[in-house]
From Swiss-Prot:
Positions of region (Disordered): 1-29
GO cellular component, one term: protein-containing complex
PANTHER family found in the cross-reference section: CALMODULIN-LYSINE N-METHYLTRANSFERASE
EC code: 2.1.1.60
Predominant cellular place of this UniProt entry's protein: cytoplasm
Name assigned to this protein: Calmodulin-lysine N-methyltransferase
EC class (word): transferase
UniProt entry keywords in alphabetical sequence: Cytoplasm, Methyltransferase, Nucleus, S-adenosyl-L-methionine, Transferase
Subcellular location field: Cytoplasm; Nucleus
Organism lineage: Eukaryota, Metazoa, Chordata, Craniata, Vertebrata
Oligomeric and partner information: Monomer. Interacts with HSP90, probably as a client.
Source organism of this protein record: Rattus norvegicus
Reported function: Catalyzes the trimethylation of 'Lys-116' in calmodulin.
GO biological process, one term: mitochondrion organization
Family per record: Belongs to the class I-like SAM-binding methyltransferase superfamily. CLNMT methyltransferase family.
Amino acid sequence: MESQVAVAGDGETEAEAGKGPMIDSASQGSLVSAPKGAVRWKLLRQVLKQKQLDDGLRHVSVRRFESFNLFSVTEAKNRGTEKEAGAWVQYTSIFYPEYSISLRRNSGSLSVEDVLTSFDNTGNVCIWPSEEVLAYYCLKHSHLFRDLAVCELGGGMTCLAGLMVAISADVKEVLLTDGNEKAIRNVNSIIASNKKTGVFKTQKISSCVLRWDNKTDVSQLEGHFDIVMCADCLFLDQYRASLVDAIKRLLQPSGKALVFAPRRGNTFNQFCNLAEKAGLSLQRHENYDERISNFHSKLKKEGSDVYEENLHYPLLLILTKTG
């Protein structure tokens, strides 16, 4: 994800560099005697506090387009006494309205510590369009998951797609994962809340922190899943190869991965190249659903300044572990 924050170099404050917000004299005075590392830290705090990160993300190009209109979102009932952070909402499929689930979305801002010290926070901000499309695809093709063990990787604060599998399919097991601990704490609360209402078709639904670059996390589940799926997880250069390796190791022989992601420059192709080198067979699909394709075409014809195919239209990649 792009960052709109520019941090001044070692030898200059942001005011001197002519960038970013000015720091008032009181703040400057408190910084003069501080070690250089502390100065940079306080400067970064000043910058990030000017605008909450989740609010700022709504204005960058990757977030201007928010939805393919596949789910309705309403305020969840009986949440008036909820004291926890985050707003509970009801997500209901527009085309399969019998499937609905209560979600706790992140409504608070991310702290500076979250940004600098936590594993990938992109999923803590919102439900991205690719996740929405994957969730819809899982509902439409719920028969594919019958009696299978399913894992969602990088599901963020809600793991919406994995939840849709758990409420619609006669699935053997569903594991919801993300590399961020804050995200998984939220997913745990979503699972616990919805178990009380009896919406899950499977009793074996759980969540855990799973970092693709952590060999221990992956090895504990090696060869366990029939289907692994993820949405819009390909654009971070430092994790792309690790994601390919994790998918291959988590899958059983002949297992499949469902990957939805926009092109985002060359990142989709780079992931495909890595997957081929790892020995996975590939099937790429651009027109995988008539509703999605029609909505995509409509947006392109309208010439909307909030929708950009390269950033927002998810392609479907099906990977198969051979041997």
